[in-house]
From Swiss-Prot:
Cited function: Functions as an E3 ubiquitin ligase.
Lineage summary: Eukaryota, Viridiplantae, Streptophyta, Embryophyta, Tracheophyta
Residue runs in coiled coils: 198-391
Organism: Arabidopsis thaliana (Mouse-ear cress)
Coiled coil as UniProt keyword: yes
Pathway(s) the chain acts in: Protein modification; protein ubiquitination
One annotated GO biological process: protein ubiquitination
Catalysed reaction equations from the record: S-ubiquitinyl-[E2 ubiquitin-conjugating enzyme]-L-cysteine + [acceptor protein]-L-lysine = [E2 ubiquitin-conjugating enzyme]-L-cysteine + N(6)-ubiquitinyl-[acceptor protein]-L-lysine
The protein's name: Putative U-box domain-containing protein 50
Pfam families named among the record's database cross-references: PK_Tyr_Ser-Thr, U-box
Keywords, in A-Z order: ATP-binding, Coiled coil, Nucleotide-binding, Transferase, Ubl conjugation pathway
Amino acid sequence: MEETKTHELEVEAESGSRMEKVYIAVGNDVQEGYKTIHWALKKWNNIPISIVLLHLCNISQDFVYTPFGKLPASSVSEEKLQVLRKYEDQKIDKLLSKYITFCGKVCPLSVNFVLFGKSKSAISGSFYVYQNKPEFCEFYIICGGKMVSLKNDVNNNNSNIRSWIGKMFHDPGRNLDRSSGNNDDPTASGSSWDKNLQEIENYFQQLLSLNLAEEETENVVEEEQEDDDDVALNVLQHMDVAEKLEYVRRKVNEAKLMIDEKSREVKVNAERSNRAEWAISLCNSRIGEFEAWIKEESERREKLQATLDSDKECIEEAKNYVEKGKTKLHSLAELQEVLSSKVKTMMEAKSQAEVELERVVLQRGEMITEIEKLRSQRDVFNRRIEFCKEREVIGSVSKEEVKCGYREYVAEDIRLATETYSDRLRLKSGGNWTNVYRGRIKHTTVAVKVIGDSLSDEAFGAKVKLLNEIRHPNLVAIAGFCSQRPKCLLFEYMHNGNLRDNLFTSQRKSRRSKILKWHDRIRIAHQVCSGLGFLHSVKPKPIVHGRLTPSKILLDRNLVPKITGFGLIMHSDQSDTKPDVMAFGVLLLHLLTGRNWHGLLKAMSMNQTSILRDLDQTAGKWPLELAKEFGALAVKCSSVNRGGNMDFSTKEIMEELGKIREKADEFKTKGGYEEATNSNMDEGDPNDIPSVFMCPILQEVMKNPHVAADGFSYELEAIQEWLSMGHDTSPMTNLRLDYQMLTPNHTLRSLIQDWHSKRAAQASS
């Protein structure tokens, strides 16, 4: 019967903590036991544990260890049996005391552990404990102070050996790349393994069982031998001679038996050696095959590794490309966000600008309406002012002599005003030169008409007196005269030329031409009729113009018409005003159609509906009702010598024109046709010349504008000629110039060139 002596070393833990135990199995080898305990203390030095020392001893009630060997207890006296057992107990107690002294104080551990000191005599017991230990317990085998790795139990070892042998005998060519054409065919060598597979497996199992049996036998023999040696020292002291002889005889017989057994073992070992050489040769051949396969596998792995490295490089490049793409995408996303915010801001600004533009457009419309009203008021005031001035002049003439109502100039004044009758200041009419010059006297621009010697001094004086007596807002007023040769008459200067140059298309190349709208034409007709009616109402005899044509109608800055060229037939006996009425009717047709041809009157008389077809489109969209009435009045005036219109006077014409003008003003105030076409005609007509483009001297569009000291821009040739003639004053202000240096006006020149380009484009389209 085996007995286990234990000695438990415990250290009380803190209250409430649980003490776990570490079981350390020790044997009779003290040094080996010390190493095992030292390993356990080092492993759990910082953990509270309780150490339990285990010592296994074979104590049986039926057998006892004596110097003669293991004998039955019945063959030994009771006294000797007690002595032997007491000696064994003392030896174990001394051994445990040494272990306890070595341990010292230890701390408890929360897990149970079992440690076995490994020695040759404890191998089989260790395996037994390992196989039968509970699952919650950890098991360690310590040999020489170091942990020994454990193998599985015998059954697991057998199955593992079978599995290992099966893998070893399995054809590894199946796991290799079958596509390789250089591999050796493993069928021949594998067939020998297949044939000997079971035999080799049995051989290895036999070796394993023999090793375990021999180890156990050896352990038992060694243990018995050690025990016999220890016991023999004490037992032989109590034996007599006969017992000692019997003991020697038994030992001799045991030696003989041992020799026979060893002889048999030699034979068995020789057979086992042959079988081992046979197994080794098979294993060596198999190892060679495995090495060849391993080499092929290594080469294949190297190729796969190279391919893998190449793929990794491609993957890295792809990753880098993706990262760059992500970075670029992130940048584009940020840029898109910035652009989106800018677009949003611009859209908001655009919305605000559109709202502001609508507001400005409304304000512009209101301002245009207000400007038109102010212009109308200005025209009315100007006409009233002129009328008042004329009345004052007429009143003064009736009381004083001729020279008291106007001024007489000397020939030198006239030469200075006209720059000695320079052709540059000579005025044209319909492209033909006239005997009228533009001049400047006393800071006032005047028109100087050269009479020459065509009239005698008496006739010239009578003409001057007559012109001075006749004053009307729609008649050109005389400003002075010169009785010295050449005789001259001075009239107020009309800046917009005559009606012919402004009305007819062939004459609109003049720089001073203006686009006359339909309501302006009605107003001009009414004002011309007013001036003509004033001439016809002179007492005692009416003054007949006799040559009323568009060239005899001059326009001032405000497009107010004034009649010129009258007074030549005032002393004749002719008192019939019908020629003037007929001429006025033709003038109305000119205003309506903007055409100047001899068959116009005949065509209109034959078919009055053709008037609507031949309306002047540059005048804007005529109201249908006004166009019909205006055309009917024109035909009626031009047909005064035919039918029942013999007594049609200017007074009646004035009444009808007054009604037509009232309707025209009403249309214009309502903003009907006129506002719908006025902007289009202003934008599309290339003849509407900005005043800033005109040279103040030549009254033509400048080609090379230069700025003088007075701040005005002039044509270079004109201002140079002005300065070369000795003038040191401004042509516009008549003030002294501080210097005569001229500066090119590039900005104005660029604007003029752009204006010419637009005119050419509009003309080509």
